[in-house]
């Protein structure tokens, strides 16, 4: 590998490591060019591919999510990191049900969520989802009261390590669900993100 290509790869790696958020191809190119490093998008892609190969036998991986590329710990190693975080990342069953309904039925109103869940949606759940930046208001339904329409955000996709909402697993058919299966799927491990 030519020295310049290896340097570009190292520059890209350092940007991804230090950014604290996913970076788009165009952002990487712009940052490098602002530092006097002439590079086109194809070279950035080659650098990312080389990084992906370099990490194949390590605990790190290059991941493409909804808002760009990021470095992260592979899932196989995430259990080792749980003691580093004091924040409890477990989500309540009601929060999980609410975000699931929004993800699969978006755009959806609070009333529609309540109709599907069969119980009232707590203001704290909606606030929690908004504070996590997992949902946002996309508009208002043209009905009496003009209820807010909720959709998921790119942050939600990033935290689930997916690029687009269609990457979510399909919903099982209604008759295929037993109550035990519904209860067993109410936890997401966010520590690897």
Regions found by a protein language model. Name each.
Residues 1-12, 70-97, 193:
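Short alpha-helical segments that sit at the start of domains
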Residues 1-2, 7-8, 158-193:
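Phosphate-centric recognition/catalysis
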Residues 12, 16-17, 21, 88-108, ...:
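Short amphipathic alpha-helical interface segments
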Residues 22-32, 107-117:
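Short acidic, hydrophobic short linear motifs in intrinsically disordered regions
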Residues 38-50, 117-131, 144-147, 178:
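Short amphipathic alpha-helical interaction segments
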Residues 52-63, 133-142:
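A short, conserved structural fragment
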Residues 64-83, 139-162:
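Short, cationic-aromatic polyanion-contact patches
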């Amino acid at each position: 590998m030519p020295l310049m290509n290896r340097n570009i790869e190292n520059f890209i790696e350092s940007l991804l490591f230090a950014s604290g958020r996913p970076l788009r191809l165009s952002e990487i190119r712009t940052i490098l060019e602002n530092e006097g490093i002439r590079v086109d998008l194809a070279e950035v892609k080659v650098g990312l591919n080389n990084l992906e190969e370099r990490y194949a036998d390590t605990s790190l991986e290059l991941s493409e999510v909804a808002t760009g590329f990021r470095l992260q710990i592979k899932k196989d190693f995430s259990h080792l990191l749980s003691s580093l975080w004091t924040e409890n990342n477990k989500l309540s069953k009601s929060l999980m049900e609410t975000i699931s309904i929004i993800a699969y039925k978006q755009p959806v109103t609070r009333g529609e969520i309540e109709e599907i869940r069969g119980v009232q949606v707590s203001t704290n759940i909606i606030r929690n989802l908004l504070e996590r930046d997992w949902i946002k208001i996309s508009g208002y339904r043209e009905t009496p009261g003009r209820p807010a329409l909720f959709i998921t955000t790119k942050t939600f996709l990033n935290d689930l390590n997916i690029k687009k909402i269609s990457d979510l697993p399909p919903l099982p058919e209604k008759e295929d669900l037993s109550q035990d299966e519904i209860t067993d799927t109410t936890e997401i491990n966010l520590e690897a993100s």
